């Protein structure tokens, strides 16, 4: 049933919501698939009772339990998916009635996150089609870099030309880099002059970054000349004082024609000390929450990664269609836009779109209590950070109350003094910050964890996915960078899974069953490494040994495996296609799940165990957004896998690839020339081999820098050969694979053994 929401003031329909057409078929299929899973569990239990060796059966049972659970978490998001539509053109309000907006942009490393990228993101939101005096942009520089500070000073000067140009000419691409690199940008004298100004600014910033320091000759603003003296020899990214600088003030700054008011632009680098925990990105966001609370305290907050520029100047008004709706705004915590990326290869070879996480699952969540928070592109209700909708948790000082009206100048001395105080590294001691107030601590995936806790407190959220992307970002172009990013996510997800606020316990208790199961999908996703490892090695070794671990083709249970496998993959493919994907992208996405399971998830689990045992400390490694390697970029555009430098991360993956290839050759030979019924094993091995084709090419055929290293291939080969040699050295011990039960031995293996005895 379609629902409409109206703005009670002007009576316009601002947004609609309607269920997806696939809901009923998915619900029917869920019943049949559930029955199939129950039958499979019965088969496993029966095999466990009758088997001579329980280890193999237990491993297969464990793997199928994980697969069944992950299917249940996905299915919970398929039972009530909805799509929404907004009407921003119908939003009507006087300029003075528009709510204020605070924008939080986070960066941490000027070399992995180039300052010009930060500049373009900041300029794109400063130029929103919105009253400029209502916008305040806060840039958190967690690396405390003078290079980033210099770039933002340059951005403030350029904005006085850029913002009037955008609004006067109704420019849609309000990131200067995107606008000037497009073929459709204006060729007028004004535009060409502005392009020259931008290129000059870009040249200065990149020169400073390349040299690693800000030379005095480049500092043209006397107002900020003394600020650079703060970067002394003792200043480091892990130990430095608070720096807060107002680079642009809406109360006093106007464009060069004196017609347009400029938005606020504030640089924030919080105090850091090696003896005080800083809680990574969550700590930086909480610092911005307090600093902005003291200075502007806008009721709406937009969080952005430094590479996620605004692609639509009307995005803010789209969010207001929900955030100002009197019927839902009191319980609405945030409006989440999907992450979308520019520069993705034609078939998204690394599955960087993350369509399942950012689109498919979000549509499912939206039919329950609302989407998860994904770390960027999210408009928050400031009140949501201060306790449940029904109970306001007061902060420690009155200046941080969410409903306070900030009526003092942001450059007032007492305001700046208090802002420096709340950005101190010991300010949060003995407060509710990170536990009951603000972004939550306890996981490296602070975004997902915070969204989960807000939902548990009773807040709802909305997924806004307009046809024109609201934001565009950058994605890894090298498999090493992607795997490194996923390891960090895996550790954070494990932290969430095993905490006292685990979605499977606290989530299901605090939320309804479907929402709780849906929230289990991502935190338990690293457990995919269990079935991927078991099914990547066990049936293959069985096939090489001529032993069956699956039902034969003549066994009725054979068809249960076929139906469950093809049914699950067909539903996954339909999800992808119905949300605008393609078959090739889906294929790459499911292949990347295998790669992540045997690399990121595998090593993420090891790192989590070491961290739990206090044998290592958590690390927040910034994913590089700098794409300076032309050869690497060329390989990505040609959709050639780039395994980068020699890395142990790919050792399990390479080992599995080698085992599957040998099993495929041996199994195919056995079936073609000796007969037999190991069809399920051979089907699984064939599926794995096709998925591993890029790995085989990187091992043998390629000579470029993106190939798999000889060391990794050598170690992987030795692992397989070593395991085989152990078997040969112990002929008197029956292989565990042959003890599954006697009548599981394949026909072709028996015939082969019989022929050998006759020849003797």
Swiss-Prot record:
Its EC number is 2.4.1.-. Disulfide bonds: none annotated. This is Cellulose synthase-like protein G1. It is found in: Golgi apparatus membrane. The keyword DNA-binding does not apply. Its main location: Golgi. It is an enzyme of class 2 (transferase). Pfam families: Cellulose_synt. Thought to be a Golgi-localized beta-glycan synthase that polymerize the backbones of noncellulosic polysaccharides (hemicelluloses) of plant cell wall. The chain crosses the membrane at residues 28-48, 54-74, 530-550, 558-578, 593-613, 656-676, 680-700. InterPro entries: Cellulose_synth (IPR005150), Nucleotide-diphossugar_trans (IPR029044). The gene is CSLG1. Keywords: Cell wall biogenesis/degradation, Glycosyltransferase, Golgi apparatus, Membrane, Transferase, Transmembrane, Transmembrane helix. Belongs to the glycosyltransferase 2 family. Plant cellulose synthase-like G subfamily. GO terms for cellular component: Golgi membrane. The active site is at 142, 447. One of its GO terms (molecular function) is cellulose synthase (UDP-forming) activity. Expressed in young seedlings, primarily in the vascular tissue. Signal peptide: none annotated. One of its GO terms (biological process) is cellulose biosynthetic process.
